[in-house]
Amino acid sequence: MLIWLADWLTQFDSGFNVFSYLTLRAILSTLTALLIAILIGPKMIRYLQRMQIGQTVRDDGPQSHLSKSGTPTMGGLLILAAIVVSGLLWADLTNRYVLVTLTVVVAYGIIGFVDDYRKVIRKDSKGLIARWKYFWQSVVALGVAFYLYSSATMSAETSLLVPFFKEVFPQLGIFFIIITYFAIVGTSNAVNLTDGLDGLAIVPTILVAGAFAIFAYVTGNANFAEYLNIPHIPLTSELVIVCTAMVGAGLGFLWFNTYPAQVFMGDVGSLALGGTLGVLAVLVRQELVLIIMGGVFVMETLSVILQVGSYKLRGQRIFRMAPIHHHYELKGWPEPRVIVRFWIISIILVLVGLATLKLR
């Protein structure tokens, strides 16, 4: 939005042309989202406490979690507000990729909000019934998938980039819709499963979003794309602004969510952040790299699938508790140790994902 104002003001002072530079707007986007989260955070936490919008803790989980009962939740609203406001201010809103991404942020945020509202405010322990949650996630994901497929103007927009292999860009055709669907819905639910310890989900989200900012920049830059031998998609450049807004908002939220957490993001945050990472992966054509960089999310999800499958088939559990972060807690690891070690794993995996730009 401000890019339009700066463009108009350029006729009076050429100095305003500086706001057309993507790198400057990326920095300002990060700082704007960070400041929004830092400044509004305390007020939101006090409001949530006053309204008694607190987390309910299961009594069959780690005993250390019982002290978390009543901690304000639905703090994801703070993250989403910071992302959307910063994105609207600093991104080019004529870019359809930006609009699609912000739509996913809001749509999945609404789904998560309804789930949290039913669980926390209406005291319905089941929240939004699973089949309805999945239904609405699917509606949004399929709507985005069909739109992106039908509006594609370049073959690169619907090709699959295979990491570590040079010049392997198979055309997906109609399978693009299927991959897009699973990328968005799958990542949304994976981040939701990961969000079980203080700061556990937000730091990998920040790291992956930061990496996608790099992918978006090089994919949208013709010179870098040619040098790295990746498809050039000009529209991805503006996604840098959304990615950096996610980084800033995430850092601001981490200020209050770090151990011991003053607020939890709730489903309104985790579902929206996961869905956004999924659509970003699709837009920058890095769905397979998302599996690498989001390895912590994948690990958490697989632990649940294996646990449920093993119990139904054999009547035995593989882990003491799933998702797997609870398994390590029940083994005696202090919560901060579990969190930081998962962060370290995430840092390593993101670096491996970034290395795919050159190692091919």
Curated annotation (Swiss-Prot):
GO biological process: cell division; cell wall organization; peptidoglycan biosynthetic process; regulation of cell shape
Cell compartments where the protein resides: Cell inner membrane
Enzyme class per UniProt: transferase
Keyword Amino-acid biosynthesis set for record: no
Keyword Cell division: yes
Residues passing through the membrane, by range: 21-41, 73-93, 97-117, 134-154, 168-188, 199-219, 239-259, 263-283, 288-308, 338-358
Pfam families according to UniProt: Glycos_transf_4 (PF00953), MraY_sig1 (PF10555)
PROSITE patterns attached to this UniProt entry: MRAY_1, MRAY_2
Keyword annotations: Cell cycle, Cell division, Cell inner membrane, Cell membrane, Cell shape, Cell wall biogenesis/degradation, Magnesium, Membrane, Metal-binding, Peptidoglycan synthesis, Transferase, Transmembrane, Transmembrane helix
Catalytic activity: UDP-N-acetyl-alpha-D-muramoyl-L-alanyl-gamma-D-glutamyl-meso-2,6-diaminopimeloyl-D-alanyl-D-alanine + di-trans,octa-cis-undecaprenyl phosphate = di-trans,octa-cis-undecaprenyl diphospho-N-acetyl-alpha-D-muramoyl-L-alanyl-D-glutamyl-meso-2,6-diaminopimeloyl-D-alanyl-D-alanine + UMP
The protein's required cofactors: Mg(2+)
PANTHER family listed in its UniProt record: PHOSPHO-N-ACETYLMURAMOYL-PENTAPEPTIDE-TRANSFERASE, PHOSPHO-N-ACETYLMURAMOYL-PENTAPEPTIDE-TRANSFERASE HOMOLOG
Function according to Swiss-Prot or TrEMBL: Catalyzes the initial step of the lipid cycle reactions in the biosynthesis of the cell wall peptidoglycan: transfers peptidoglycan precursor phospho-MurNAc-pentapeptide from UDP-MurNAc-pentapeptide onto the lipid carrier undecaprenyl phosphate, yielding undecaprenyl-pyrophosphoryl-MurNAc-pentapeptide, known as lipid I.
Protein name according to UniProt: Phospho-N-acetylmuramoyl-pentapeptide-transferase
Lineage: Bacteria, Pseudomonadati, Pseudomonadota, Gammaproteobacteria, Alteromonadales
